[in-house]
Amino acid sequence: MAKKMAKTNAVRLIEQQNISYEVLGYKTDGQPVDGISVAEKIGYSLKYVYKTLVAAAGTNHYYVFVVPVAEELDVKKAAKVTGEKKIEMIAMKELLAVTGYLRGGCSPIGMKKLFPTYIDASAETLDFIIVSAGKIGMQLKLAPQDLARSCDAAFAEIV
């Protein structure tokens, strides 16, 4: 009998919002993994798998960006959509304290606070995207519009 995965905060929140989703799991030793290897482990094309990045403008002014795993956040475009002059990625050591999530398991859903969130516009035309479910080894497959609704996100050109 297969072992049932424990629900994360991200899963609980989307269930409360009656959002359709699928949990995808993969074997892990608990160490952080990169998004490209996650796509390979779950057997999906890179175009569907997105990573969650957290950036800051000054002190305690955080933004969340959801971008394809094979792409990089364009910080100039990101600053423009946020209305900030400059944003920078937060240090890895700050991630847990700011979001409540570890590197490799950071979900745009269910962070400690609801930060302004932007999903790359490339996701809008897809039937589904895959993001972290809030822990290493667990991903969520859901419609991009449902992801946006779940974390009050906007779509924007950010890569």
Swiss-Prot record:
Coiled coil regions, renumbered to chain: none
EC number(s) recorded for this UniProt protein: 4.2.-.-
A Pfam family this chain is assigned to: tRNA_edit
The keyword Nucleotide-binding appears for this protein: no
Annotated GO MF terms: aminoacyl-tRNA deacylase activity; lyase activity
GO BP: translation
Enzyme class, spelled out: lyase
InterPro entries cross-referenced by the UniProt entry: Prolyl-tRNA_editing_YbaK/EbsC, YbaK/aa-tRNA-synt-asso_dom_sf, YbaK/aa-tRNA-synth-assoc-dom
Keywords, alphabetical: Lyase, Protein biosynthesis
Family to which this protein belongs: Belongs to the prolyl-tRNA editing family. YbaK/EbsC subfamily.
Protein name (database record): Putative Cys-tRNA(Pro)/Cys-tRNA(Cys) deacylase YjdI
